[in-house]
């Protein structure tokens, strides 16, 4: 399938998606862009204990939004999957954070809009997992 998007200059682009892609229900307005929180679905979604959250930059190199990688086996697997959904010259990758699923759920359903990269939240910094 293809995902269509609008560039900052107003032009329309599209990507061929390599993984299932969507958003979490009941999170509209919580994403940095004011939309729902986006998610890529990996092959092990039924058994995942951890979530990998990618902080993405815009064309100016500033934080744009976070993308959730759910159902991936490792940080490396999640990053590779994320990058596979963008062109070879994509420079939007900023950081990736591995956190336990229960910590992520608390962050996901908070009552405020995301204003900074996922990796910058103090509660996340204390709970992150390093590989």
Where are these regions (language model features)?
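Hydrophobic N-terminal alpha-helices or hydrophobic patches in metabolic proteins across all domains
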Residues: 1-131
């Amino acid at each position: 399938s293809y995902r269509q998007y609008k560039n900052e200059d107003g032009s329309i682009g599209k990507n061929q998606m390599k993984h299932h892609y969507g958003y979490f229900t009941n999170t509209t307005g919580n994403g940095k862009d004011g939309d729902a929180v986006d998610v890529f679905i990996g092959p092990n979604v039924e058994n995942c204990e951890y979530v990998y959250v990618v902080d993405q930059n815009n064309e100016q190199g500033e934080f744009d939004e976070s993308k959730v990688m759910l159902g991936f086996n490792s940080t490396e697997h999640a990053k590779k999957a994320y990058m596979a959904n963008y062109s070879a010259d994509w420079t939007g990758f900023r950081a990736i954070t591995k956190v336990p699923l229960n910590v992520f759920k608390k962050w996901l359903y908070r009552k405020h809009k995301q204003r900074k990269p996922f990796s910058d939240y103090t509660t996340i910094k204390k709970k992150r997992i390093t590989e």
